[in-house]
Amino acid sequence: MGLSWALLPFLLLAFRAELLALQPALGSQPPSASSSHSMGSSRDFVSNVSSSQHPQPPGSEASAGIPDSNRFPQGLNSSHVPGLFRTNVSAEEQYLSPDVTSSETPPSRVSLDGLDSQDPDKDSGLPFLVKTPASQISVQTPDTKVPTKASGSKLSLEHHNLEPGSKISSEIYQAASFPQQVGGPLAVLVGTTIRLPLTPVPSSSPPAPLVVWRRGSKVLAAGGLGSQAPLISLDPMHQARLRFDQIRGGLELTSARLDDAGVYTVEVIRGGVSQQIREFVVGVFEPLPQLSVQPRAPETEEGAAELRLSCVGWNPGSGKLSWSRDGRALGTSDPEGAEPPRIRTERDQLLISRPVRSDHARYTCQVRSPFGHTEAAADVSVFYGPDAPVIRVSSDRDASPALYVTAGSNVTLHCSAPSRPPADIAWSLADPTEAAVPAGPRLLLPAVGPGHGGAYACIAANPRTGHRRRSVFNLTVADLPPGAPQCSVEGGPVDRSLRFRCSWPGGVPAASLQFQGLPEGVRAGPVPSTLLVTVPARPELSGVAVTCLARHLVATRTCTIIPEAPQEVLLQPIVEETQPGDVVVALEVTGCPPPSRASWARQGRPLAPGGGGRLQLSQDGRKLLINNFSLDWDLGNYSVLCSSALGAGGNQITLTGPSISSWRLQRAQEAAVLTWDVERGTLLTGFHIQAWTDSSEVDRVTMSRDWVSLLILGPQERSAIVPLPPRNPGTWAFRILPILGSLPGTPSQSRVYQAGSDLSPGAIAGIVLGSLLGLALLAGLLILCICCLRRYPGRASVKKQHSLTLAPVLTPPAKKIQSLTPVQTPRPLPIKTKMQSPHPAKAQQVISPSPTLCPGGSPWTVRAATQV
């Protein structure tokens, strides 16, 4: 029997009993149109049930429709359906009045809201239309024709007799509203029982409720509540596993299977009107599986086509599958039509296209269900590299070792090459003969030298993939050239050009040389080590500074040369005593700057440079050396000529033996001062100050009156101070003996030093003669003046008006104590230089008297003081 045939008798009986039970209440209680009907569904629920015509009074027609058993309600809402029922719920009973304000109500019919319980006769003849949103049941009164038609079963119900003129009050006893789904989806395991309770349990008071259970659009069970209520229908396909509770209205489905999952709906119907609809979302899951990722140790290379990981043990019924990498969830595949991502999922597999090194991670597949979760993981190894090796250099001395390292520093080379697994590092040195090359990322080069410079190759090899990469680093070891750059300039052929030369040889790498200051248009470098530039000779080049700029990795040095014409050329003799008795004489020319060349001559005969023998010229030609000098052979005239493209000049000198050209003896307090001169060209190595005396108090002088050397002075000395005994010094004789090596020269003339206050007879005679001569001259002058005055008396008076006035001459007082001693010399001797003595003495004043006539005619001795 179909569902329509099963529901038809129960529906008719329930509707008839409801009408009979509500008839007395309609006359005593007015219906209310303000109550709401509790219903909801996620699907549309529409079915029409038509019943066959029954004999009814005229104008009385009732039609009812029941839901289609093959359609599942989804989005049912009372606000969307015209002609909805509104209920007024009180503590005792509920009243239902139809709302016929919808446009679907024919205008010839009167809605249930227009019924008046106080005038039953008037209302009994009006049509009564009732439509529910769920069942679309139409009831017309007072006609009792109730056509009932269930769609799908094509069944026409038999007519039922209703009393004509009876007042019908559609009273529906419904329970309190309940939500569509309580507690979220229902999850069960395969093989367990699905229990769907109906909460709250509908009241079993008449009219008896009808409970219909569906899964989707398929009816699973339908029946009334109560122990005496019949069970109308059970789905034949699930009849063996279905249990319908007719007391509480619940449903049980034993031995749950995966296909039992879905949306279950329960509908409570009273008197042909759907009152309650509730949905249950049921999920059926298999127990959580034991998962594993295959392959267990996946390996691939960077740039491979793809890598697939499978989550073994998962099936769709056990739960939702997800993948993660290092704990971060991986996104799902892109929508259809978009470019597929590089990492995507396909069923139970994770596909990694074109793996890269960042894909090296731990991948986890996880299955999650309401009953828990399980997971499995695998470590994916992505081999790559080696990349191009990178060589870094460090030095304990240098700030920028990548450019160069200085000789003697300790250098370390570091090589790194990103690779998985780590690459094996090997070195290839610049020196191919080096056999013991250590393996590893660090290469130590202690105390590097120029031989360590060159190319160093780092070779990185991946031991897993076999790939190899190589990089080369050029190590520069810088060694500064010794000394400093040397600059020179010399004349070209026929003195028409100047050749500038700069040299700084040695060093690693070679220094770069360049001239600065040369005329424009002259190519002046840079060149390594040695630079030679020829410039046409021009007068304006004289005095111009030309600088050579020498650049090296370690330092930058300069040298400057100024080409000049010869000026004030002068020869100077230089005497050196290399060994006792062995003398070397040199002639050095000054005022002969580069680019001048010096040409030497002796006694008018030119000297060839580099001729050998005892006469030798220096490398620059500006010094003439005379080895093993001999007074018999090497004395004479020497000359030099300096010439260049800028001018010429010369000088000559006559070399003589050791001698004194002139000397002086002066008195001082308790000392004798000697000064002397020598001719230019005199060769000597020192002076001996010699003396003898007739006083026996001097221990250094013998009674035989031999000359004794009191002082020995150097060749540059030109004065000497000889201290004398303070008491009774006596008479002294002094002379100067020049020395050349071990050979004595010609001594000077001797001079006598007379100590004490008594004048010698000669001095007294001189003073007397001088005084007489002075008086005679003064008398003659007076006589001459008298004669002139007598001869020219007028002019004398005029002259008297202009008397002669002489300014007084002031002599500054002496700073030291002076002594007066008469000597035979008429004037003092000037002192030029100081004399050094083995016994140091302080500088003293030398005072020599000078005879002068006093106003009275007698001579005075005037002191002449000289500070020594």
From Swiss-Prot:
Cystine residue pairs: C311-C365, C415-C458
Glycan attachment positions: N48, N77, N88, N410, N474, N628, N637
Originating organism: Mus musculus
GO cellular component: membrane; nucleoplasm
Listed Low complexity bias regions: 26-52
Domain Ig-like C2-type: 289-381, 389-474
UniProt protein name: V-set and immunoglobulin domain-containing protein 10-like
One protein family per Pfam: Ig_2
SUPFAM superfamilies xref list: Immunoglobulin
